[in-house]
Amino acid sequence: MMLGVIGGSGFYTFFGSDARAVSVETPYGPPSAPITVGTVGDHEVAFLPRHGVKHEFSPHTVPYRANLWALRSLGVRRVFAPCAVGSLTPDLGPGSIVVPDQLVDRTSGRDDTYFDSGGIHVAFADPYCPTLRAAATGLPGVVDGGTMVVIQGPRFSTRAESRWFASQGFTLVNMTGYPEAVLARELEMCYAAVALVTDLDAGIEVGSGVRAVDVFAEFERNMPPFKKLVFEALEAVEVERTCTHCLTHSGVQLPFELP
């Protein structure tokens, strides 16, 4: 069973020249980019850059439904989602790698379901797959747990927003973690975010606040060890999928067949 990786800002490639590119059409249009398929350990792995190969898509315009549908149609059932995040606590500085266990949605107007009809309601109390999380958090230096609040973007938070997020106990702030996680759940795909802290958010940092140029520079600085960690997380996953946490449609009549 194929594994998937959805790369975030600055994470546009994953394999060498021996990987094959696959173009996939979906009922929701094309995904962000052609999907590349290669091998990591005992696994066949499909890689998709969330924002496109040249960062064509801002967080609010990413074709999330097409991306997840395309991966599932290729046989992907388990997905790691590397992403860039801001930290809402000084305890997690730039370069920290965190595997969150909770998510808060503060986006608006995004296409966040495949079930516009049919009365389908997925369980989402625990948004991330515990098996995939364990594979990543078992690696050295990875912080286990935390709440990631997802904002609409593409702008960064005001200081007041950032301080409010921190006061609620949120740990990380991001722009792409939703609806990606819930769409994966609707397609019964195991999903776990792996977050690289690129900055202290505006309510924590002094000076001018968060700047995109600094975020991308920090991500680029940390890309080699971050990619290495994702490779190691993939290698740590069992070949056969045994997790049932994300199989949310048992006994439910769906309005269409999943790919």
Curated annotation (Swiss-Prot):
The keyword S-adenosyl-L-methionine does not apply. GO terms for cellular component: cytosol. Pathway: Amino-acid biosynthesis; L-methionine biosynthesis via salvage pathway; S-methyl-5-thio-alpha-D-ribose 1-phosphate from S-methyl-5'-thioadenosine (phosphorylase route): step 1/1. Its EC number is 2.4.2.28. Keywords: Glycosyltransferase, Purine salvage, Transferase. One of its GO terms (biological process) is purine ribonucleoside salvage. This is S-methyl-5'-thioadenosine phosphorylase.
